[in-house]
Amino acid sequence: MKHKRLSGLLALLMCSVLMAGCAGMAAIDDYAVNEGYELKVSSSGTGNKAGSGKSTPGISKDKIKVGVIHLSDPAEGSGYTYTHDIGIQGMQQNLGLSDSQIVRKNNISDTDADATRTAIKECIDAGCNIIFTTSWGYMQTTAEMAEEYPDVYFSHGTGYMSNGRNFNNYFGRIYQARYLSGIVAGMNTRTNRIGYVAAMGSDSAEVTGGIDAFALGIYSVNPDAKVYVKVTNSWFDPQGEEAAARTLLNMNCDVIAQHCDTVYPQTLAQEKGVYSIGYNSDMSKEAPDACLCSVTWNWSAYYTSAVQSVIDGTWDGSNYYGGMNENLVSITSVASFAAPGTQEKVNEAKQQILAGKNGVFDGVIETNTGATVGTAGKTLDDSTITGGINWYFKTVSVVE
């Protein structure tokens, strides 16, 4: 999702930061304040941003207890919650924690602050000393609970709030993998009409930035292809996601990509005999004859480092923004039935990204309104990528 997601408010905040002089790819140290909480966006490279700079008391591994708040049930399939829980399981295995040291709260609506508060409080009452809240809508309640319980560590996924002490934010450069998946789509469409099921519209920089990165990847290999976006206005809506995919198929789109939580766009593509691009985890198992590749998260990379920092006493409230170099985001191998040369083209572009020679949002970029963003010879900075992309690339159209 997910989730979840930079809002128009964040974009406004970031605009003020940019006007103050942020630009380029140099290391940044940008802050904005929202209701008393410090907003921090990490620089590229290491994936971490300095927090308070103060060390914290370590907690012995046998005393660690981890809480995780999930939007849905991990057992539901290959979507967002499943992927986060695979990351939690990976962390547990990496650190040698027992099952009793993990407390899960599933099916917690991120639009219900009372339910979120109750779930977090139950984790605290169960003895959890670090709690991960995985969906955008948990952000405000997580921030409030962090102030109420300063001795508990809180880590919120996909938002922007943090306090530099016991509450941080984590997300990743998923746009890098989106770009690569765009190359795959662009090399395999026959109609030059590619569909994209999007959870949110242009007020979400996370979703819109992903669409633009995808479209830029397509454009790099097939400038004649167009991207058609259908928005569901929900992070998790199985029926709505399938309906959106069906609309795009009816428009003669022959590749369906997605930024939403379930596998329904994939299974519909499988049923209708067209190609698809999965998201969150490898969705080829649900759509073996359709899925060309999947844009994936390896959340265990972050969860392991975060819990280890609490054990070691090195937690400092840093925000985390990892990418391909940190093994947080990637795409799966291209399907054997893809067009010849697809995997080779992806490999070439991936090496350029890893080497810092392709920042995805490079140079002057033309939007679908005819306006331009960016500067020749420069890459959009992290503040803009995470909070200021409310425009669509010139090959993108939104379907009403």
Role assignments for model-derived ranges:
Residues L13-M14:
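Repetitive helical segments and hydrophobic/amphipathic motifs
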Residues M1-L10:
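Bacterial N-terminal signal peptides that target proteins for export
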Residues V17-G21:
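C-terminal motif of bacterial Sec signal peptides marking the signal peptidase cleavage site
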Residues G24-E400:
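A residue-level marker of the well-folded mature domains of exported/periplasmic proteins
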